[in-house]
């Protein structure tokens, strides 16, 4: 078995991307395979593990951490955001949790505690970059979050979660933010004022890197 055959013998999340990138499979065949991601394998498994309030929880870990990284995993599988099960999962997450700060600790908490919905983000650019990318992928692009990130760009062109204590950008934070901004820009198109501002900010961020 060669490497391509090995990838094609994997679960749908891997197989459809291997078909798209490494074979001559038709777009229809690739789309049909991609549609299976939310129905079987790890994509379906992660959807099934979502709790009633929209969170994914892991013992000993903050709710925001396990939820954010599960969402990033789902995006990496290429799960179809138009599938009913995916749309329901995103609606639960959006309705059931809020970002807020209690006792100097940001966390995802019940909606009655107030704060931002998941896709509106919190205060750290590295987290918000990932959150912005997720909102763009799952059909909930948040302009308020994009504008917040634009306002937090440092003089050297990048971003840093430790700003304003540090005036020097971080590669990690900058990459997280740039990934979010480009995903948002692709989701909304290039004709809007905010998309033009994003394009300019991205160029500065890329020059910093």
Regions found by a protein language model. Name each.
Residues 1-209:
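Preference for long, amphipathic alpha-helical scaffolds in soluble/luminal domains
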């Amino acid at each position: 078995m060669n490497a391509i055959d090995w990838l094609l013998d994997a679960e749908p999340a891997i197989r459809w991307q291997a078909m798209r990138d490494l074979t001559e499979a038709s777009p229809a065949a690739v789309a049909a395979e991609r549609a299976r991601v939310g129905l079987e394998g790890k994509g379906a498994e992660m959807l099934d593990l979502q709790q009633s309030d929209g969170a994914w929880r892991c013992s000993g870990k903050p709710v925001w951490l396990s939820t954010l990284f599960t969402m990033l995993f789902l995006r990496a599988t290429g799960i179809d955001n138009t599938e009913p099960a995916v749309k329901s999962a995103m609606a639960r997450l959006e309705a059931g949790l809020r970002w807020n700060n209690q006792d100097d600790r940001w966390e995802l908490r019940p909606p009655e505690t107030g704060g931002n919905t998941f896709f509106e983000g919190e205060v750290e650019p590295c987290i918000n970059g990932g959150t912005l990318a997720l909102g763009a992928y799952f059909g909930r692009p948040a302009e308020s979050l994009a504008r917040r990130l634009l306002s937090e760009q440092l003089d050297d062109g990048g971003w840093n979660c430790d700003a304003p204590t540090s005036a020097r950008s971080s590669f990690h934070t900058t990459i997280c933010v740039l990934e979010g901004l480009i995903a948002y820009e692709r989701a909304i198109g290039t004709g809007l004022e905010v998309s033009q501002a994003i394009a300019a900010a991205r160029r500065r961020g890329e020059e910093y890197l």
